[in-house]
Amino acid sequence: MSVQGIDGVLQQMQVKALQASDTPIARPSVEPGFASELKAAIDKISDTQQVARTQAEKFTLGVPGVALNDVMVDLQKSSISMQMGIQVRNKLVSAYQEVMNMSV
């Protein structure tokens, strides 16, 4: 292979490297991780509470099609999800305190 052939290949490689560096890297909009999962769980608890509040309000106003048993089930779901969220928070705080008390 001649020197001119190698120079041509080298030039092509440099052009490709420049093109690659100009191309933005596509990153996922939501990076999977603990923080995003925790936020999703908290949002779900909030949504459950909002649905229960809305159902209770509709029942109180006498909107047709809203039964008392549906309202009670939604309120219980909301209560249980909130209790679970509190327990998870307590475990997280406990784990954080345990890690902070470790000697290095």
Swiss-Prot record:
InterPro entries: FliE (IPR001624). One of its GO terms (molecular function) is structural molecule activity. Pfam families: FliE (PF02049). It is found in: Bacterial flagellum basal body. GO terms for cellular component: bacterial-type flagellum basal body. It comes from the Bacteria. Keywords: Bacterial flagellum. GO terms for biological process: bacterial-type flagellum-dependent cell motility. Belongs to the FliE family. NCBIfam families: fliE. This is Flagellar hook-basal body complex protein FliE. It comes from Pectobacterium atrosepticum (strain SCRI 1043 / ATCC BAA-672).
